[in-house]
Regions:
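Short His-Asn-centered micro-motif
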Residues: 54-55, 136-139, 221
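Conserved phosphate-donor/acceptor-positioning beta-strand/loop module used by diverse small-molecule
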Residues: 137-138, 148-172
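The conserved 3'-phosphoadenosine-5'-phosphosulfate
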Residues: 211-285, 289
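PAPS-dependent sulfotransferase catalytic core
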Residues: 1-118
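PAPS-dependent sulfation machinery
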Residues: 66-146, 151, 177-193, 272, ...
Length: 310
């Protein structure tokens, strides 16, 4: 539990940059969530079956949500939203779901338990969108996957996985932007490379525990990029939904609203293939050896390499 909440604190600070809220607020939300995990007994279990998308940051969860979100039966907010984190932040509820102040007040008055509150947030959103299925994307869903399955045992979890070398290279300078007084501005980030590797390994291992569940699926970012039609057919079959025509899939970006936020800055753009294999030019020989030592065997297990001779 200490490791989980420690990871959450780091992620909350990153979210603070993205959402433009103070670090103080981010830490407060972390402590509230931690207190709930420690003290809340399993009093409420939701029957809702949301589609939950997660994975190591910079692994393609935004692309996965964009492709899933164009399905006519699915309601999916364009901005990332963690189903059990930030759920009582008024600004986020308003900006992501379009809830009015009155609707938010009613939700908070009626539902004190976090899991119950989250369920009713999703129900209200589906009602407003006229849909029967909801999909939510946030990279850090993978960090709390155990808690999510505990309170939403019927959820379908889509774990997006990317070559750890590319993900680590991207994580090193993430986030590149931050929100200041409502404006998106450049942000200089230099995360330690070993931290980036550990983050990727941790996220992969969190998901591996659920491989035997029929409500969990792993999807490679590279497959989404190189073969979106067949990959999405596999995903929609997993979700029990009809597949979408290939031409509509490839034009997914045309269906997104022209509104940019830090979490979805790539929204509205076609599939970009050039970042696959970026590690070949980004990583030094020393960093390659570091990755082999820390995560090389996991890379082989995921079939990104046949051995450590790369």
């Amino acid at each position: 539990m200490q490791k989980l909440t420690g990871n959450l604190k780091k992620h909350r600070i990153m979210d603070a940059l993205i959402y433009g809220i103070s670090r103080k607020t981010a830490i407060f939300e972390t402590l509230r969530f931690r207190a709930w995990l420690f003290t809340k007994k399993l009093k409420y279990t939701s029957n809702l079956n949301p589609i939950v998308i997660g994975g190591c940051p910079r692994s393609g969860t935004t692309l996965a949500r964009s492709l899933i979100g164009i399905h006519p039966e699915i309601a999916s907010p364009k901005n990332e939203y963690n189903i059990l984190m930030w759920i009582k932040n008024n600004n986020i509820l308003e900006s992501i779901f379009g809830f009015s102040a009155e609707e938010i007040s009613t939700l908070k008055t009626k539902h004190k338990d976090l899991a119950c509150f989250a369920e009713n947030v999703l129900k209200l959103y589906m009602q407003k969108e006229g849909k029967q299925v909801v999909a939510l994307k946030h990279p850090f869903h993978i960090i709390i996957i155990d808690e999510l399955f505990r309170y939403f045992p019927n959820m379908r979890f889509i774990h997006v996985i990317r070559d750890g070398r590319d993900a680590s290279c991207s994580l090193r300078t993430h986030p590149k932007r931050k929100m200041v007084e409502g404006e998106i501005v450049p942000n200089t980030t230099k995360n330690p490379f070993d931290w980036c590797i550990r983050r990727w390994v941790s996220c992969i291992n969190q998901g591996k525990k659920w491989r035997k569940s029929d409500k969990y699926i792993e999807v490679k970012y590279e497959d989404l990029v190189n073969d979106p039609a067949n990959t999405m057919e596999k995903i929609f079959k997993f979700l029990g939904l009809k597949a979408i025509a290939e031409d509509k899939l490839l034009d997914f970006y045309k269906y997104e609203k022209d509104e940019k936020h830090l979490q979805n800055i790539e929204v509205g753009k076609p599939i970009y293939r050039k970042n696959i294999g970026r590690w070949k030019k980004d990583m030094t020989e020393k960093e390659k050896e570091m990755f082999k030592r820390m995560a090389g065997r996991l890379l082989v297990e995921l079939k990104y390499e046949n051995d450590l001779d790369w």
